[in-house]
Each structure stands twice: as structure tokens, then as C-alpha cells.
Amino acid sequence: MGRLFGTDGARGVANTELTCETAMSIGRAAAMVLIEVEHRRPRVLIGKDTRVSSDMLEAALVAGLCSVGADVQLLGVVPTPAVAYLVGKYQADAGIMISASHNPCEYNGIKIFNGEGYKLSDNLEEEIEAIVLDGAQTPPTPTGGDIGRVSRCDHAVDDYVRHLLDVTDVDLRGMRLAVDCANGSASATARRLFSALGADCVFLNDQPDGVNINENCGSTHIEQLADFVKKLKYYGGVAFDGDADRCLAVDEQGNLIDGDKIIAALAMDMKEKGELDGNAAVVTVMSNLGFFRFCEQNGITPVSTKVGDRYVLEEMVNSGYAIGGEQS
């Protein structure tokens, strides 16, 4: 873990720990590193969740990026995976997500993706840290037309939902489902997605007001969803976290279906369809013994990594595995 970036970006209480000055410095440093790597004027996408501080930090990041000569395209409120996907689709050089995931609204964070939609390597993060914290390089100060430009993308959500539908082979017609959006990024996408899949859904906590993100709702407070599903006899329910990069589920009795169970079920389905590349499923050391026993009993190789989705993805990419995830 670095001095500024943890396993999931830079995080802290917005405006005291993660200040506008820090965000602007990260923007400047990121643009400097991108120019050094790409040898051209870079274009950076920025997405955000629904926290009241996200607009403030977005403005600071934009100022930092543009002041060094990077162009910025604003995606608005989107899930974190949307930024990772759209970087490639829009052929941008990097993407930044402003979010603190499952944390309360007081917190916020900055997560950077490279041009392939993967989190930055440790080396590039350390280079950014050295510029921000140690003043390792002096930022350039372009003028006139060399200053970065800002544009807004009005179709980011549509493009992301269309992508999800293209890669999802499932028919939810006739299923009564409850979906908890955590008053976060899923509020912008879940209704369109589940409706297009044919599900008969009720959407909970999909009215964000800037401060109610993750407030007694979402994947870290799944009791509300469990009670709702059980009492109203729904088929099941899905709960997202604030930036919609994780979800948990409940069955018709309100029983928790955690990440281990979701990964096990998906891996088994893929194995039966002949789609489980490497015949393995990647998880972290936090996965429970039941997951490993299930895999062994069903001829699936469980592969463990350090905690953090970046390490799961690295293992999947490096070894050619088709599925991976975290217990949480």
C-alpha cells in the first residue's frame, strides 16, 4: 500500500483528509505521467458517484488535469465499472472514478484506470505519489490552446447499459425482484438494466440526495432488503454498494447470498457450458472454506490472491481465467 493510494485508490474524509488541493495535485500529476507515457496530449474520462463532495472533487481534478494540458470528458454519475469499460470504448488514455465505494457520505476517493480499463500499476501510482507528495517534478504551465479542454458525455449510461445487455445471456421475465441501489451510482443504471432484462422489479434507495448514499442501505446494510423480500414474497433481491462495483443478493427467504456463493454458482454454470477457461475461479484469501470445498467437489480449481479486486483481476488476466471476485 502506497503513501497516497491504497488497494482501491486514494480515500479519506472529503475536504479535510481528501482536500481539493490534493485532488488538484493528483490531477496535475496524473496528466504529467500520462504525457510522459503516451507522448501526446492525453484524454481522461471522469465518473463520479452521488456524494455531495463528488462535484467539488471533480472540479479540482479537472483543474489539475487541464492545467497541465490534458483534455477531460465528464461522464456524470456512473458505476465504477462503467469508467473502466468506457475508457476502452471511447479510446481514452485514462479514466478516473470519484467515489469511496461502501463508505459513508463524508468519505470520498479517487481511483485511476489506465487506457485498457485496468487500475494503474504500482509503479505509476508511486510516480504520481512522488510528484504529489515530494514535488519530484515541476508541472508544466501551458497557455492558450495548449490548456486542456472539458466536454460532457450525455450517453455514458446508455452505452454502459447497452454493453451489459450485450454480454448478459439471461431472461428475467416473470421474476419479481427487489433491487437496492444504495442511493448511489446504481440509481443511474439499475432501472434501465433490469427492466430491459424483463424483471418485475421494485427499486429501493434509488433517490440520492448527496448525503444518503450507503445510509442504512445497500450491500453493507442488507437487512432492509432481506426483510422486504421475505415479507412481500419476492423471488429474491440484489443490493449494490455506493459505486455499484459490488453486489450481494438474498433469496426468497431473505438469506444472504454472498460473493463466495455468487462466484461458485457462476463458475459452475460456466463449467457446464464449457466457458470456464482454465477450469478455475479466482478469489482472495478472505473466501471461506466452504467455497474451496465446493470447488474441489465439482472439479474447479480455486485460485487465491491478496485482498483487493485489482489482484483478482491481475491473476485472471495473467493466467487467462474467466471468472473471479471477492467474498464481500
Predicted regions and their residues:
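An N-terminal, well-structured beta->alpha segment
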Residues: M1-A63, S67-V68, V150-R176
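Gly/Ser/Thr-enriched, mixed-charge loops and adjacent short helices
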Residues: V13, N108-K230
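N-terminal small/polar loop signature for handling phosphorylated ligands or for N-terminal nucleophile
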Residues: M32, R40-Y107, R192-V250
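Conserved PLP-anchoring active-site segment centered on the Schiff-base-forming lysine
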Residues: V44-I46, V179, D277-V282
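Proline/glycine-rich low-complexity loops and linkers
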Residues: A82, E126-V161, D166, Q253-G325
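Short beta-strand-to-turn element immediately C-terminal to the catalytic PLP-Schiff-base lysine
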Residues: I112-G115, L248-E252, E296
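Short acidic/histidine-rich active-site segments
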Residues: V238-D241, A322-S328
